[in-house]
Amino acid sequence: MSSPSFPRVLIFDSGVGGLSVYREIEARLPQLNYIYLFDNAAYPYGELTQETLIARVDTLVTRMVEQERIDLVVIACNTASTIVLPVLRAKLTIPVVGVVPAIKPASLIASKAIGLIATPATVKRQYTQELIRDFSANKNVELLGSTRLVNMAEEKLRGKPLDLEELASILQPLKNTIDVAVLGCTHFPLIKEEIQQVLGEQVQLIDSGLAIARRVQELLGIEQAVGAKQKHRIYASAPPWEESALNIKLEQLGFNPVQPFLHPI
């Protein structure tokens, strides 16, 4: 049962990666009412055209905002954030927070080189190149784009063990070349321990989760709190694969079982 006295926050992603952002916000502001919506009908977003992505995010988010009387939206997807934020901010009257790869803080602490681990779409996007140019021009940035890492995070959340040899093979280009790695996809903090194990303790891993949590707190004007855990709602645009296994993990994170949010787009 949601508490009507606290703001409602919508967290949106194409998959379950945004749950890493939810964990950071919820740890800081447990008293809020959280609604999570993932557009798994169009997962992964990196393979969509820009026009299709904008249409899907715009439609699903605005409908959920109306249905649940949302007070703040978090677009917990790097691919969507770089494209759709201006559209949503022009349309909605509530705050919309996006995700940006943590290139700027990484450049402040890297002494060797930075590794940006993201989706192929994020790595190729002009927005990412501009971030590197503006905030890390004096540091070498190694780019690694992988869709398989995204799927590995999805599998882990359904109880499947990660193949560390496969992970090591994917991350091999960054081995012994960097001292800071930016987790540039919200899925990747879900497999942070395994990435750390492969790259070694000498590599510092950073992501945008905590910065997003602080921004949400600032926009809502709410004090950090320790509160009783409550059950939140999670919606999917299509039936999730291995839904029963996923619901087990979702319950541990404070969610009721996945509900359908089926809207033609």
From Swiss-Prot:
Please verify whether the record's keywords include Flavoprotein: no
Record-annotated active site: 77, 185
Pathway(s) this gene product operates in, as recorded in its UniProt entry: Cell wall biogenesis; peptidoglycan biosynthesis
* PROSITE patterns xrefs: ASP_GLU_RACEMASE_1
Annotated residues for binding of substrate: 13-14, 45-46, 78-79, 186-187
* Catalyzed reactions per annotation: L-glutamate = D-glutamate
Q: What is its EC number?
A: 5.1.1.3
Q: What class of enzyme is it?
A: isomerase
A single MF term (Gene Ontology): glutamate racemase activity
Keyword set, alphabetical order: Cell shape, Cell wall biogenesis/degradation, Isomerase, Peptidoglycan synthesis
Q: A biological process (GO) annotation for this entry?
A: regulation of cell shape
User: Which family, according to the similarity comment?
Assistant: Belongs to the aspartate/glutamate racemases family.
Biological function: Provides the (R)-glutamate required for cell wall biosynthesis.
Tell me the protein's name: Glutamate racemase
